[in-house]
């Protein structure tokens, strides 16, 4: 691997020898790039080399295109092309497949006067075959420009294979783009079964007859810098293509959870587009609930009619990045959002600081209305994909745990409530490392304090602003609570 410093210090001949194979049998591009030094980054080098091609006359560009091999054939080609085609599966074609590729390539060459070119890295032989069929329908000028675009992509991949930017001291900039509100609905996804059952919840699985998800996709990588600085879209994956990619892969997903779907899509994105360095996917579930049905004089649950739920919703977040040939999950968590719970009594708030700024009265028994966002992380992210359903933690179970603890606890504060909810979740699911909370206090204001003949009261919405809390409950917290409970049990027995 070479660094930018290495390339900038080479003499012209050494640089030409080093970069001569980046463009197929066209070392003249590397030779001319020597005069454009210094190169500040891989993207800068790629931009300058492609700029040389763009500035060349039409005949020179056509000559460059014609130097590329015909995909899927056995004709002589450069070592780089051999390796790229083998990785795409073109080196192991069955005889019938080989003859099909040979025929289509000849048809393409006869139609346009130059070979079919495609940056095959990350693609399968099926992808290549489909692209060849589709592009046979194009106009010549469209294909001429597309051939150059594919050559630029190939050059980018080849540069990334031999150049490292490790050790460069420039600060990494924020640079990403993506697509939001990618709605996808799937019927008859594989059911989620075999989850661990807990005392606080009746949840036993999901039939997944109707599944909805709202996905946000954000990608990053140095390859996209020219699109910002120069308006060069050569390596840009259109956000509309991202939308199509996500929606169509919901059809081929064979798992049972949103977490697993995001993992599947992230890997497919990075496998397909090898110039992407990072991807962040957020999937918010769109829940559907089966409606009642009256069949054969009995009330049952419909297997056909579902109601979209407007209650709390679950969300999953996954971040992945490329490191060489390895894809690493850098962050993954699951979350239940906008869980709104009210407990009509058994809540207090007393003993807080009272000074000249205090107007809030102490209350030994009040209703408490809380909004909760609860997120959890696994020690092993593979557990979130439900390959072993018994180690998967469902949002429905977290919801039921939260309401159960709220019911059981004499609540002295929201802070104490979320602490005990978190400890209970970690006690039930030892595969989790921590549980985080974002909570808000939306307790109602009293309108009528006493109603004759009733213990009820009348309330209204609270005046803004609202109080909030952020807190993470750790595995250590849960262990401390477990020890305290054991000590209390021993003291009672004594």
UniProtKB/Swiss-Prot annotation:
It catalyses: 5-hydroxy-2-oxo-4-ureido-2,5-dihydro-1H-imidazole-5-carboxylate + H(+) = (S)-allantoin + CO2; urate + O2 + H2O = 5-hydroxyisourate + H2O2. Pathway: Purine metabolism; urate degradation; (S)-allantoin from urate: step 1/3; Purine metabolism; urate degradation; (S)-allantoin from urate: step 3/3. This is Uric acid degradation bifunctional protein PucL. Residues 175-494 are annotated as: Urate oxidase. Optimum pH is 8. GO terms for molecular function: 2-oxo-4-hydroxy-4-carboxy-5-ureidoimidazoline decarboxylase activity; urate oxidase activity. Induction: Expression is very low in excess nitrogen (glutamate plus ammonia) and is induced by TnrA during imiting-nitrogen conditions (glutamate). Expression is further induced when allantoin or uric acid are added during limiting-nitrogen conditions. 5-hydroxy-2-oxo-4-ureido-2,5-dihydro-1H-imidazole-5-carboxylate binds at residues 69, 81-85, 116-120. In the N-terminal section; belongs to the OHCU decarboxylase family. Gene3D superfamilies: Oxo-4-hydroxy-4-carboxy-5-ureidoimidazoline decarboxylase (1.10.3330.10), Urate Oxidase (3.10.270.10). Its EC number is 4.1.1.97, 1.7.3.3. Optimum temperature is 37 degrees Celsius. Retains 90% of its activity after 72 hours of incubation at 20 degrees Celsius or -4 degrees Celsius, but loses 50% of its activity after 12 hours of incubation at 37 degrees Celsius.
């Amino acid at each position: 691997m070479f660094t930018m410093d290495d390339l900038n210090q080479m003499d012209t001949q050494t640089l030409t020898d080093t970069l001569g194979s980046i463009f197929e049998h066209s070392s003249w591009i590397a030779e001319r790039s020597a005069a454009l030094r210094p190169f500040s980054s891989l993207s800068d080098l790629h931009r300058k080399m492609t700029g040389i091609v763009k500035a060349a006359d039409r005949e020179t560009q056509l000559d460059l295109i014609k130097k590329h091999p015909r995909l899927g054939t056995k004709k002589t080609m450069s070592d780089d092309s051999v390796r790229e085609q083998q990785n795409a599966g073109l080196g192991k074609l069955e005889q019938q497949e080989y003859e099909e590729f040979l025929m289509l390539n000849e048809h393409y060459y006869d139609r346009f006067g130059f070979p079919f070119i495609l940056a095959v890295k990350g693609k399968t032989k099926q992808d290549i075959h489909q692209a060849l069929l589709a592009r046979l329908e194009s106009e010549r000028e469209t294909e001429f420009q597309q051939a150059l675009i594919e050559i630029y992509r190939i050059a980018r991949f080849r540069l990334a294979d031999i150049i490292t930017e490790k050790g460069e001291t420039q600060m990494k900039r924020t640079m990403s783009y993506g697509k939001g509100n990618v709605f996808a609905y799937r019927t008859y996804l594989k059911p989620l079964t075999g989850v661990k059952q807990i005392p606080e919840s009746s949840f036993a699985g999901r039939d997944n007859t109707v599944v909805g998800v709202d996905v946000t996709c954000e990608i990053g990588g140095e390859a996209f810098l020219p699109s910002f600085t120069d308006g060069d879209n050569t390596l840009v994956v259109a956000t509309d293509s991202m939308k199509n990619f996500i929606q169509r892969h919901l059809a081929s997903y064979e798992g049972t959870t949103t977490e697993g779907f995001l993992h599947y899509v992230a890997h497919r994105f990075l496998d397909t587009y090898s110039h992407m360095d990072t991807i962040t996917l957020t999937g918010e579930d769109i829940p559907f609930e089966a409606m009642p049905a009256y069949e054969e004089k009995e009330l049952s649950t419909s297997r056909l009619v579902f109601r979209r739920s407007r209650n709390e919703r679950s969300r999953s977040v996954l971040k992945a990045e490329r490191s060489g040939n390895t894809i690493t999950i850098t962050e993954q968590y699951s979350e239940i959002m906008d869980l709104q719970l009210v407990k009509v009594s058994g809540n207090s708030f007393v003993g807080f600081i009272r000074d000249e700024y205090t107007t809030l009265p102490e209350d030994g028994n009040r209703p408490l209305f809380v909004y909760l966002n609860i997120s959890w992380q696994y020690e092993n992210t593979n557990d979130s994909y439900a390959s072993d359903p018994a180690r998967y933690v469902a949002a429905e179970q977290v919801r039921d745990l939260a309401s159960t603890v709220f019911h059981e606890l004499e609540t002295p504060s929201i802070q104490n409530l979320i602490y005990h909810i978190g400890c209970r979740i970690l006690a039930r699911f030892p595969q989790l490392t921590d549980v985080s909370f974002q909570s808000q206090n939306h307790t109602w204001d009293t309108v009528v304090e006493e109603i004759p003949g009733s213990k009820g009261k009348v309330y209204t919405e609270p005046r803004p602003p609202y109080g909030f809390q952020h807190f993470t409950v750790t595995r250590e917290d849960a262990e401390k609570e477990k020890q305290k409970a054991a000590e209390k049990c021993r003291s009672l027995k004594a």
